Every structure is written in structure tokens, then in C-alpha cells.
């Protein structure tokens, strides 16, 4: 397993960013120094909420979706959802994924 870290940043104006890195200290410094993602350049980091070691490449999207569920899709970026402005198709996909993840529907056919 790769030594990937997932990090969650609290940003200005109630925004959040989820990222992944093999070099957490270096990458976090980039965000805090204005050299990070477009989202963290627009909304400056306030604090590191979580740093999660021993993750895999898929965990970034998982944590991004979890944060979107908690804080709203307009307030969180990360993983496959890094664009400053999400298009309608992307918003539809995110909402569908969130509904599917929280659905209590039985899977009787399986």
C-alpha cells in the first residue's frame, strides 16, 4: 500500500478542501503559502482539520463526498471535484452519489 495521506483543510468563508499527498508537510505548506489548488488560492486555508495516513488513491473522493454531504457541494472541493464552479452534470453526479451512499433501499435481488 502506498503511503498516501488525505488532508482536510478548513478555509475562509466556511469552505473546505480535501487533498492527497505523499509529502504532507510540503503540500500543506504549498496551500498555506498560496501555491496550492485554485480553490485554496481563492479561499485561504485557516487550519488543518484532519491528516489521515495510510490511505489509498480512492480515499480522496470518499472524503470529499463525505465533506460535501456534511457541508454542501458548493462549500467543498477535492479529488475528482476540484473545479471552482461545478457544471450541472457534475452537480447531478455528486447528488446521485450522495443519495446512493445514504440510501436505505434493500438490495433484495442480490
Write out the residue ranges for each language-model feature:
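Structure-specific nucleic-acid interaction/processing domains
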Residues: 1-110
Amino acid at each position: 500500500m502506498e503511503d498516501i495521506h488525505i488532508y482536510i483543510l478548513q478555509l475562509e468563508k466556511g469552505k473546505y478542501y480535501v487533498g492527497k499527498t505523499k509529502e504532507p508537510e510540503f503540500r500543506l505548506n504549498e496551500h498555506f503559502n498560496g501555491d496550492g489548488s485554485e480553490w485554496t488560492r481563492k479561499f485561504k486555508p485557516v487550519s488543518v482539520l484532519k491528516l489521515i495516513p495510510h490511505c489509498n488513491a480512492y480515499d480522496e473522493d470518499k472524503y470529499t463526498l463525505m465533506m460535501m454531504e456534511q457541508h454542501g457541494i458548493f462549500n467543498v472541493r477535492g479529488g475528482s471535484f476540484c473545479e471552482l464552479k461545478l457544471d450541472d452534470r457534475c452537480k447531478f453526479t455528486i447528488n446521485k452519489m450522495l443519495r446512493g451512499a445514504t440510501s436505505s433501499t434493500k438490495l433484495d435481488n442480490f
